[in-house]
């Protein structure tokens, strides 16, 4: 798998299971633009770099209260990396 699109969750375990299991080349997290504390996200990146040194981790702020905004963000990522290369993981998201 090339690109995993994931909804960032406050629960760290929900953020790492799919990438560590599926081992994508790139993981793109859509996170709440109102999130102030980025320490957990930095720790997540460190975890991936230790376990999958070649992975690319991206984070995109979105208004998580708007389904329309979330859908538009997912579509932009899918267009950027070609939809056939993308997998959307929906079990997380706070």
Predicted regions and their residues:
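Active-site histidine-anchored catalytic micro-motif
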Residues: 90-94
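Long, low-complexity, Lys/Arg-enriched
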Residues: 1-86
């Amino acid at each position: 798998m090339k690109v995993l699109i994931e909804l960032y969750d406050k629960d760290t375990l929900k953020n790492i299971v799919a990438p560590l299991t599926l081992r994508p080349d790139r993981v793109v997290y859509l996170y709440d633009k109102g999130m102030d504390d980025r320490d957990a996200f930095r720790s997540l990146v460190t975890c991936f770099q230790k376990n999958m040194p070649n992975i690319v981790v991206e984070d995109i702020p979105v208004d998580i209260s708007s389904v329309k905004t979330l859908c538009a963000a997912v579509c932009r990522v899918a267009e950027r990396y070609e939809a056939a290369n993308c997998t959307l993981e929906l079990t997380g998201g706070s």
